[in-house]
């Protein structure tokens, strides 16, 4: 049954070319400085170059463009899915309401408003905003679009993997994928593992919102008791049921990173590309650096996903201060890391 579920998802990914009505084919950029530093060939998939500065546009458009007889779209989001839904609805001339946590960065709230969507701020976390949005959509009889646990959304995100394979001369040895609710992980992993099972897929999570790790330990999606909000784009309490079903047996490994390690990766991305990634956007690189160092990987093709660049400017001082700590911890990490920090799947 699970194999059929994966096959169905793969077919949906291949049929998701409508995303290019609104999204770009983002470039995959070789990173010479980082490659030299880590002793591998490192590539960065630049999803920060999408019109809403995040990959989330793909899944939102793929889902909404297939809906029929729509009255009004409702979504819950910490920011990037919200912008994807808002831009999609603007293009398709649909009305939309977006429920966002009170902690959402102002840059994301304002971007959604500028795209013409109604913004409702509710709750301190994504999950609280989600619960309100579900209730609101039901009361109004509006269509709710899930940010990650929907096959059409997952398929839209999976188009990133198609581009990645087409853009590289050789298949990557490792692909590091950031995880919040698991939509990006599911879409990319299904495609990558279908075309080449030898590609190693590593899930990367912020250590204070590691819902995929918890689900794997328990064998099913399980709610975290606490969710950190520094990496707001992946601050999800519970992995999606569909995303976990698609990924639990085909993702090769999982790793978590600290806030300091994320800040260090933001700095490294700036030094390499002159782009300021949001915390979730730097998650993939942070995980790649930590995993490569701890496993002594050399001379491999490494693919990372810069999945978003929507961060308030006033957070930069905090990021700068923590980045130096993150770099220092990597030196210690090379000596002290043990297998307990990884879940091998």
Predicted regions and their residues:
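PLP-dependent amino-acid enzyme catalytic core
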Residues: 1-342
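Short alpha-helical "recognition helix" segments of helix-turn-helix
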Residues: 345
């Amino acid at each position: 049954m699970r194999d059929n579920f994966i096959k169905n998802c793969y077919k949906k990914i291949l049929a998701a070319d409508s995303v290019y009505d609104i999204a770009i084919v983002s470039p995959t950029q070789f990173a010479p400085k980082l490659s030299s530093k880590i002793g591998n060939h490192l590539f960065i998939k630049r999803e920060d170059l999408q019109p809403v500065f995040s990959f989330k546009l793909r899944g939102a458009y793929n889902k909404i463009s297939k809906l029929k007889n729509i009255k009004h779209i409702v979504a819950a989001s910490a920011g990037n899915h919200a912008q994807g839904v808002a831009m999609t609805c603007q293009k398709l001339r649909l009305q939309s309401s977006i429920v966002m946590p009170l902690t959402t960065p102002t840059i994301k709230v304002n971007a959604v408003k500028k795209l013409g969507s109604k913004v409702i701020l509710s709750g301190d976390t994504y999950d609280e905003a989600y619960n309100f949005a579900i209730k609101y959509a039901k009361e109004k009889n509006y269509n709710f679009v899930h940010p990650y646990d929907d096959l059409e959304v997952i398929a839209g995100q999976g188009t990133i993997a198609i581009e990645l394979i087409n853009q590289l001369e050789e298949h990557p040895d490792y692909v590091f994928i950031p995880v919040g609710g698991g939509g990006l992980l599911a879409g990319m992993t299904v495609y990558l593992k279908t075309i080449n099972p030898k590609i190693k897929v590593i899930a990367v999570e912020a250590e204070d919102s590691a819902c995929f790790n918890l689900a794997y330990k328990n064998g099913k999606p399980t709610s975290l008791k606490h969710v950190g909000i520094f990496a707001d784009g992946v601050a999800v309490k519970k992995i999606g049921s569909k995303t976990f079903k698609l990924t639990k047996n085909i993702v090769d490994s999982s790793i978590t990173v600290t806030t300091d390690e994320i800040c260090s990766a933001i700095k490294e991305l700036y030094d390499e590309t002159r782009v300021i990634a949001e915390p979730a956007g730097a998650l993939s690189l942070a995980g790649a650096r930590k995993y490569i160092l701890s496993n002594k990987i050399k001379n491999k093709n490494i693919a990372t996903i810069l999945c978003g660049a929507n961060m308030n400017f006033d957070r930069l001082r905090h990021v700068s201060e923590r980045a130096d700590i993150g770099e220092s911890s990597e030196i210690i990490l090379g000596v002290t890391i043990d297998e307990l920090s990884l879940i091998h799947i």
